[in-house]
């Protein structure tokens, strides 16, 4: 079992640091793919005057029947709506009904008011073995909210049946083998889509000689063979420290790797780029990829995305974690509209996964002047309405 350390600790030669500090030659290890800025709120009521101290004004206080109620500010709600518009959310009857989505993350705080109507279908704690859902980090709650919130914030597909596998610990990191177990559990529990807002450094070689622990890539590929859709974060090492490829297991060919954009639809600078040309040096080895499997495949909101916090309030999240859940939700809406693509005894298979990836490639909104795949922008920006239309052929 690989040792996991929080940020700032110096690892010994036998220990592995969090994933966004990893060099290409290290083994995969996971941490949350978002930088969540918690909003600390202090409310004081004196002589009928309500004072709110909230970084970024992400929350507001309402006095109702003598009670103090917390809610997102208009600024946060407007930003939420702007991102829905950016990805062309259909805002119609499709809400993910009949679709089972599994989130592998740090857990979920089901007591948040915006998650009161979440349709929890299953929970498994691979870290501490607890039987009741909880989140001792907060990242999982934030990601779940993007998908299934149904309060002040509205999730992309908030009527899906939600499974949650806790594979990340209180420091936000976890072991690749545990993530693999979590993916296997998702599939055995009936998930149609698995959402992985996490990632690790790729291995030195793009293949295995056998032996050792089962990897998250192995689990993802086995799931895809059964027709389960795997969506994973491209990673947050964009810029001068970018290692030239997306994180693992997003780097697996049939996994849908999701990069990030700003509210203006431009490339988010922290989003990992993908190298679709193949290379030998510098390590890791990257083999050439072909359409529709070039990395990342698609980009979605990743900068200051309004999210739920596990203290019952709201915050902003930067990272391809958030972008991943937007694409997960889009696929859930697609499966609701075309249930014949849902994995099952007489339905889903790996060919369906490639078909959906092709529709994604055909329906995205490319950046101005873009022709074909871009290593930072993928095939383009998620366009949910166009994806649904493309599926109707």
What positions do the PLM features span?
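Hydrolase catalytic cores
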Residues: 163, 167-168, 302-373
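Extracellular S/T/G-rich loop segment that most often corresponds to the catalytic His/Ser-adjacent loop
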Residues: 100, 105, 247-336
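N-terminal targeting leaders characterized by basic, low-complexity, disordered sequences
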Residues: 1-21
